[in-house]
Amino acid sequence: MSQDLFNVPIFFILFRETTEAAIIISVLLSFLKRMFNTESPVYKRLRNQVWIGGAAGLFICLCIGAAFIAVYYTVLNDLWGNSEDIWEGVFSLVAVIMITAMGLAMLKTERMQEKWKVKLAKAMQKSNSEKSSFKEKLQKYAFFVLPFITVLREGLEAVVFIGGVSLGIQGKSIPIAAIMGIICGCLVGFLIYRGGSLIQLRWFFVFSTVVLYLVAAGLMAKGVGYLEQNAWNQVIGGEAADVISYRVSTAVWHVSWGDPEANNDTSGGWQIFNAILGWNNTATYGSIISYCLYWLFVCCYLVFSYFKEKRAAIRKAEAGEWDDGDEALENAKQYIGNDGEFIVEDKESDEEANNHPKEKIESDAIKA
């Protein structure tokens, strides 16, 4: 029953994406506190822009996600008909891909704060170097546009992940998991804004990744099991329950207890094991081999990613790129004016000054 009301992957996906959105907001607010007096009208105006921009991006994402889920469960849910096992298997394998990608992102969450400091600093520098009439109009609302675009992008990414994971699950298992994920992500963002650090939550994110991979491995086994079940139904020419529920020649075990699909008082614990660990009272060679191969793939990929990131860090250090987020934001201060607007370099003036260096020197001397 519990797996029908709370979907674990949905919770962790929204928790991770909400955490990233909250970090974006907290980094911008911290930057404004460094730049301006917190009692000044400029600070209050820009702070409101940050909150409104982030809220607008989040609202649009929630609307898109709700529309997707509503369309799926009201229009598309009954399309597969007699091919339900095939669709269940395909949806499970799609969810495996989505959850695996989210697990990899979860492992990098502790570095998310530094990443967004550097990203936002680069965005400010880019706005400073590019001049256009459209950009000039947006200067007054730059601190609305930055959180709006970044939160919208992260939110749409969450919609894509949830779309892949939610296929084949019951709609009533989404709301509670989604709400709890958003609340927990906002709480983490608030703690970071108040002076915390994601590094202190490292082991929590590692634990979350392990849970996600356990779920994904279980879904891999269940997906293969659904496809095998469909093949068995084709052999016997009907529903397996009418003859025998499994192919004996490919079964590794089949026990009468521990059935997660049984509707009785003792099935609650087995339903939890089924949702998190992929437990089933019937196992086949295909489901067990796919389960083991999934873990082998994950372990090999994590080792590969570790050495890849290590080499990338060495290249960044040799190139002298920003590595410290606070240093990047400190450098970005020069691109913000006293009124909170982005300073746009006038390239034409610079070119004219380069063509007439003597006049520029005399002009600077007069100003001095």
From Swiss-Prot:
Effects seen without this gene: Compromises the ability to acquire iron in vitro and reduced virulence in diabetic ketoacidosis (DKA) mice. RNAi-mediated knockdown decreases virulence in a mouse model of 3-hydroxybutyric acid (BHB)-induced acidosis.
Example of a GO MF term: high-affinity ferrous iron transmembrane transporter activity
One GO CC term, this protein: high-affinity iron permease complex
Membrane topology recorded in Swiss-Prot or TrEMBL: Multi-pass membrane protein
Subcellular location: Cell membrane
Domain of life: Eukaryota
Positions of the UniProt region annotated as Disordered: 346-368
Reported uses of this protein in biotechnology and industry: Passive immunization with anti-ftr1 immune sera protects DKA mice from infection. Thus, ftr1 is a virulence factor and anti-ftr1 passive immunotherapy deserves further evaluation as a strategy to improve outcomes of deadly mucormycosis.
Keywords: Cell membrane, Ion transport, Iron, Iron transport, Membrane, Transmembrane, Transmembrane helix, Transport, Virulence
Feature: compositional bias, Basic and acidic residues: 353-368
One Pfam family cited in the UniProt record for this chain: FTR1
A biological process term (GO) from this entry: reductive iron assimilation
TM region positions: 8-28, 50-70, 86-106, 142-162, 173-193, 204-224, 287-307
Induction: Expressed in iron-depleted conditions and repressed in iron-replete media. Induced during infection in diabetic ketoacidosis (DKA) mice.
Reported function: High affinity iron permease required for iron uptake in iron-depleted environments. Required for full virulence in mice.
Family to which the UniProt record says this protein belongs: Belongs to the oxidase-dependent Fe transporter (OFeT) (TC 9.A.10.1) family.
Protein's UniProt name: High affinity iron permease 1
Organism: Rhizopus delemar (strain RA 99-880 / ATCC MYA-4621 / FGSC 9543 / NRRL 43880)
Gene it is expressed from: ftr1
